[in-house]
Amino acid sequence: MEQVFADWNFEDNFHMSTNKRSIRPEDELVELLWRDGQVVLQSQARREPSVQVQTHKQETLRKPNNIFLDNQETVQKPNYAALDDQETVSWIQYPPDDVIDPFESEFSSHFFSSIDHLGGPEKPRTIEETVKHEAQAMAPPKFRSSVITVGPSHCGSNQSTNIHQATTLPVSMSDRSKNVEERLDTSSGGSSGCSYGRNNKETVSGTSVTIDRKRKHVMDADQESVSQSDIGLTSTDDQTMGNKSSQRSGSTRRSRAAEVHNLSERRRRDRINERMKALQELIPHCSRTDKASILDEAIDYLKSLQMQLQVMWMGSGMAAAAAAAASPMMFPGVQSSPYINQMAMQSQMQLSQFPVMNRSAPQNHPGLVCQNPVQLQLQAQNQILSEQLARYMGGIPQMPPAGNQMQTVQQQPADMLGFGSPAGPQSQLSAPATTDSLHMGKIG
């Protein structure tokens, strides 16, 4: 038996394949197959349909009833069901509706997928008969137009090498398509269309309404939140204004209190300054200006005055008279006054503090007792006061007349300043001493 070997000239076959198919890239993977006594190049990649098939499918797509026929072709050729994304571009150019409902596409895909499992005798039928039958058939309603989106994926899988097989179609499949159309028409209830599609549209409209309501609710919630935030901002502004007003009122109160305090302090300082000026005027030969020095001078001046008064008190006879007045039993006819008692107590205290001086000391050394004319005048006044006190107490001593007293007072400064003999002053001062002794003798 002779074996026939095919000619391995790939140029002719490649030329034929390039005429049937589009231009193939150089790096494409190709498989060698034996068909009808010839070697055929078959690519392992997904095949693109030829231009003729696309034009034929575009013509059939304009008639919605051809979807069932194209689906029947896919039943006969299940190997070419895979399709690239680029093959569906021509089918997208004729969308039936502006908005494709996903519920209808899912329903149609499930519904027509059950047609693939139908089986039966096949009878060839020409394309002219199918076209006439499609012209007589009623066009599907608009709600089923989404089924067309399912058809291109199956129709686009036909290869260019099997174009001659598309001229014949089984009659049984066309009859089944008629039955399916009748079922769809009867289930739709006349010209009202498919109730499921209408329900889907109603559900879509209901979902759109609910979405609108949700949007309105969200917008209302946003407006409420914005209004609440505005209210919160206004409340915070009011609080800040209230805090500022309270701070201002507190600051004004503090400033007023400070002003009042300053005024009172100024008045007090003015009073102190006035009193210090008066005290400075009382102190002789005071040239100090500060308060501390003025007060020191005033204290020293008061101490000196106190010492002078003590010396004058001890040198005069007022101490003995006060001591005698302290005992009320000496003078039963005279009531003791509180002023006299106070003087007697002071004299006793002073006598206890200071030792009793000899009365001859002023006679021998008159300069120790009276060192200046002012002290001499004070001593003369003390003598006059002692005489008045003695008269008040009831004992009236014999005193020289007032003219003689003035003479003695005038002579004492002259004698002391002139450093004369002490006889004159002793004779002049002996008279008051004798009167005092006589007075004490009478009392005893």
From Swiss-Prot:
| Residues bearing the modification Phosphoserine | 437
Write out the domain note: The active phytochrome binding (APB) motif (26-39) is involved in interaction with PHYB and is required for proteasome-mediated degradation.
Entry comment on modification after translation = Phosphorylated. Additional phosphorylations induced within 60 seconds following phytochrome B photoactivation. Dephosphorylated by TOPP4 during photomorphogenesis, leading to subsequent degradation of PIF5 by the proteasomal pathway.
Q: Which organism is it from?
A: Arabidopsis thaliana (Mouse-ear cress)
Which GO molecular function annotations are given, in alphabetical order?
DNA binding; DNA-binding transcription factor activity; promoter-specific chromatin binding; protein dimerization activity
In which residue ranges is the amino acid composition biased (Polar residues)?
Answer: 155-171, 224-244, 424-437
Q: How does it assemble?
A: Homodimer. Interacts specifically with the Pfr form of phytochrome B and with TOC1/APRR1. May form a heterodimer with PIF3. Interacts with PHYB, CRY1 and CRY2 in the nucleus in response to low blue light (LBL). Interacts with TOPP4. Associates to PTAC12/HMR/PAP5 which acts as a transcriptional coactivator.
Region: Disordered; residue ranges are 154-265, 416-444
Could you tell me where this protein is found in the cell?
Answer: Nucleus
Induction text:
Down-regulated by brassinolids (BL), but up-regulated by cold. Follows a free-running robust circadian rhythm, with higher levels during the light phase. Rapidly induced by light in etiolated plants. Up-regulated by white light. Rapid degradation after red light exposure (at protein level). Accumulates to high levels in the dark, is selectively degraded in response to red light and remains at high levels under shade-mimicking conditions.
Entries under SMART domains matching the protein: HLH (SM00353)
Name the keywords, alphabetized. Answer: DNA-binding, Nucleus, Phosphoprotein, Phytochrome signaling pathway, Transcription, Transcription regulation
Q: What does the UniProt record say this protein does?
A: Transcription factor acting negatively in the phytochrome B signaling pathway to promote the shade-avoidance response. Regulates PHYB abundance at the post-transcriptional level, possibly via the ubiquitin-proteasome pathway. Promotes ethylene activity in the dark. May regulate the expression of a subset of genes by binding to the G-box motif. Might be involved in the integration of light-signals to control both circadian and photomorphogenic processes.
Identify the coding gene. PIF5
Q: Where is this region: Involved in interaction with phyB?
A: 26-39
What processes does the entry annotate via GO biological process terms? ethylene biosynthetic process; red, far-red light phototransduction; regulation of auxin biosynthetic process; regulation of auxin mediated signaling pathway; response to brassinosteroid; response to cold; response to low fluence blue light stimulus by blue low-fluence system
GO cellular component term, pick one: nucleus
Q: What is its main location?
A: nucleus
Protein name (database record): Transcription factor PIF5
Start and end residues of each bHLH domain: 256-305
